[in-house]
Amino acid sequence: MNTITVVDARMGRGKSSAAIRYMNRYKDSKRFLYITPYLDEVGRICERCDFDQPDSDHMSKSTELKLHMRLGHNIAATHSLFYLMDTEALELVRQKHYSLIVDESIQVIERLNITNKDFDLIINQLATEHDDGRIEWLDDSYTGRFYDYKEMANTGSLFRLDSALLNILNPELLRSFDEVFMLTYLFDGQYQKAYLDFFGFDYNIIGVEQDESGYRFSDRPDAPPPLDYRELIRIVDDPKLNAVGDKHYALSKAWYDRRGYDNPEIRKLRNGLKKFFQSIPDGSSETRLWSCFKSDVNKLVDSRTGRFRNNFLQTSARATNQYKSRTDIAYMVNRFADPNIMKFFAKQNVTIDSEHFAKNFII
């Protein structure tokens, strides 16, 4: 089994630039699959490294990905396409000896939102469960409303844990590559680390260095020069504005789920958001940004005026410089690891650094 290289370095340290340098150096002797969350980054990699991307109008992207692999092309693609790689694609990865570079953390595990009735239907009629909890679909020709679940089952990623269904990245997706690089930050607070530990992957943690030719991967953990953020960040430590978040589980997903638009605490939070933005001298729509769970945005937007709706950014946003001009930030979230997911990892005594887990989302 290959050893995974984790490039753990903060934003702006040159991780993707180092990856581009590495791929351009070895692209004639190695074959690469570079995956990233965003299509514009796929285009940038194709331009900088002369890679191909699945973009045909005449076939599915997963089919085109396998076509490029059969031809031995270097490829850039999105995370979402990577998740759809099936056994045929993995066999091509092994045959052609591909290397994988993962830009930003991949979603290695998630709890699926499903009703009890639908859960029972899948478990009792549409699929069978293996001893390890893996779900296998019974009817390969099925095209009904649970087709997405069938696709997960076909890639070996659909699991049952008690009364929950989990989508867990098939570890063969990583094991099949000759080498794997993961470009990330705060690795020890991620599901990604817990996943590697759970499935017994060996990994090395390195950083990035700069020389006369640009950025390159180092052979040791990242050691950036210290930065003094005190002149760059002003925290508005107003007891009245922040009191709604004083309790340990305040602003968590479960906290929001138990409160509707007219709840006194939600109303207080909504008014606090308004007061915060109005208190910023010279603040405008171009400088404001606020975040909460996507499912709860309507609770914090005034139903009458709709004010600040256009300043919203969901907490799952990653790897973008699109909002670098925003200077007035309200982060209305308290992140905790999903207890069902932690129960799954606990079967192998795997834990996550809770402080770094929460910090991962805000950074």
Q: Which ranges hold each PLM region?
A:
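Short basic/glycine-enriched coil/helix segment immediately N-terminal to the Walker B
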Residues: 69-72, 86-98, 175, 284, ...
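Interdomain hinge/linker at the junction between the two RecA-like core domains of SF2 helicases
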Residues: 190-191, 196-262, 272
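Conserved interdomain hinge at the start of the Helicase C-terminal
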Residues: 6-9, 17-26, 171-173, 233-287
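SF2 helicase catalytic motif II
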Residues: 80-82, 90-157
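Conserved Walker A/P-loop ATP-binding site and its immediately adjacent core
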Residues: 11, 16-53, 80-81
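Conserved RecA-like ASCE P-loop NTPase motor core of nucleic-acid helicases/translocases
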Residues: 30-38, 180-184, 286-294
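Conserved RecA-like P-loop NTPase helicase motor core
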Residues: 80-86, 305-363
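Conserved motor-coupling elements within RecA-like helicase/translocase cores
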Residues: 61-75
